[in-house]
UniProtKB/Swiss-Prot annotation:
GO terms for biological process: Mo-molybdopterin cofactor biosynthetic process. Transmembrane segments: none annotated. It comes from Pelotomaculum thermopropionicum (strain DSM 13744 / JCM 10971 / SI). Substrate binds at L75, C76, H77, M113, E114. This is Cyclic pyranopterin monophosphate synthase. Its EC number is 4.6.1.17.
């Protein structure tokens, strides 16, 4: 179990000591998606979902979730986040909304869990906003696509293109 930093020598969970690590600029990008009926996506894009403006609510939910990550994931360190962006990319051909969260900090540990949590909760908010019209939505493909900063350097998931067109960026 030597590769698992969250376990002590007895295999018990612990919060990793990061106090001796150098503070560096860190960034993580995560993505996920919500698949839905084509009619549901049309309602979202037309601003006709009965509960209100879906992307605005989901964006705020994702931002709030990133800030609450240490309250949800037991061994995460509370961090001073310096930036959180949550964006959406509708994909009518596949009847889905793609979600991207970018989280930044200058600190002693990374923000991967914060980015993943932001995407997941933004997806849950989309589900909540649209469940009255589509209970068959599927949340999925939540993944880390980029990580930079710290001793381990840069991670880039192969096959992930940069987003050029996004919805709700105003």
């Amino acid at each position: 179990m030597s590769g698992l930093t969250h376990l002590d020598e007895r295999g018990q969970a612990r919060m990793v000591e990061v106090g001796g690590k150098e503070a560096t600029r860190r960034e993580a990008v995560a993505r996920g998606e919500v698949s839905m009926r084509p009619e549901t996506l049309e309602l979202i894009l037309g601003g006709k979902v009965p509960k209100g403006e879906v992307f605005g609510v989901a964006r705020v939910a994702g931002i709030m979730a990133a800030k609450k990550t240490p309250e949800l994931i037991p061994l995460c360190h509370p961090l001073m986040l310096t930036g959180i962006d949550v964006q959406f990319r509708p994909d009518p051909e596949r009847s889905r909304v793609e979600i991207e969260a970018r989280v930044r900090t200058t600190g002693q540990t990374g923000v991967e869990m914060e980015a993943l949590t932001a995407v997941t909760v933004a997806a849950l908010a989309i589900y909540d906003m649209c469940k009255a019209v589509d209970r068959e939505m599927v949340i999925g493909a939540v993944r880390l696509v980029h990580k930079s900063g710290g001793k381990s350097g840069v991670f880039e998931r192969k096959g992930e293109e940069a987003w050029t067109e996004m919805q709700g960026t105003e």
